[in-house]
């Protein structure tokens, strides 16, 4: 009876190792797909700053000037931010940068451009300051 239990134990042990290897493979595939989604989502948001599914098509319909180039916010990433696994992986490995750090960098760039006299807003959330009318 001990031989039978030992065989069963070895069989289960082998099965467990196989399942762990399969899980690692699936995790790698999932991570790869999520990174691809992150990259493609960023490209979509940058290329369609005049109108997209996230912000809407108001500026596209109104025929806004194509010279204005709006930078998207990291909060606009509907697909990437919906995956808790991907966010954990990014935080662990630092891959793709920290989202808060990326937001801060974009804010710094926007404020530097405004200081240089460029009044063009850098994102859909920022608006140029209104000048008070002097009579």
From Swiss-Prot:
From the Swiss-Prot or TrEMBL record, state where the protein is found.
Nucleus
* A GO-annotated cellular component: nucleus
Coiled-coil features, chain-numbered ranges: 1-42
Region of interest: Disordered: 92-135
Keywords in alphabetical order: Chromatin regulator, Coiled coil, DNA damage, DNA repair, Nucleus, Transcription, Transcription regulation
Biased composition, Basic and acidic residues: where in the chain? 124-135
BP GO terms, sorted = chromatin organization; DNA repair
Family note: Belongs to the EAF6 family.
Q: What job does this protein perform?
A: Component of the NuA4 histone acetyltransferase complex which is involved in transcriptional activation of selected genes principally by acetylation of nucleosomal histone H4 and H2A. The NuA4 complex is also involved in DNA repair.
Q: How does it assemble?
A: Component of the NuA4 histone acetyltransferase complex.
| PANTHER family linked to this entry | CHROMATIN MODIFICATION-RELATED PROTEIN MEAF6
Q: What is this protein called?
A: Chromatin modification-related protein EAF6
- Source organism: Yarrowia lipolytica (strain CLIB 122 / E 150)
**Lineage start:** Eukaryota, Fungi, Dikarya, Ascomycota, Saccharomycotina
């Amino acid at each position: 009876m001990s031989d039978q239990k030992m065989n069963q134990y070895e069989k289960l042990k082998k099965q467990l190792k196989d399942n762990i290897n399969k899980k690692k493979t699936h995790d790698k595939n999932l991570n790869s797909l999520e990174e691809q989604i992150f990259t493609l989502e960023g490209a979509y948001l940058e290329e369609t700053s005049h109108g997209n599914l996230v912000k809407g098509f108001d500026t596209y319909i109104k025929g806004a000037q194509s010279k204005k180039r709006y930078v998207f916010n990291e909060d606009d990433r509907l697909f990437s931010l919906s995956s808790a696994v991907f966010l954990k992986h990014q935080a662990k490995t630092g891959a793709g940068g920290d989202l808060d750090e990326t937001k801060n960098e974009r804010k710094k760039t926007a404020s530097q451009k405004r200081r240089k006299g460029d009044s063009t807003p850098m994102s859909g959330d920022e608006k140029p300051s209104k000048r008070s009318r002097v009579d």
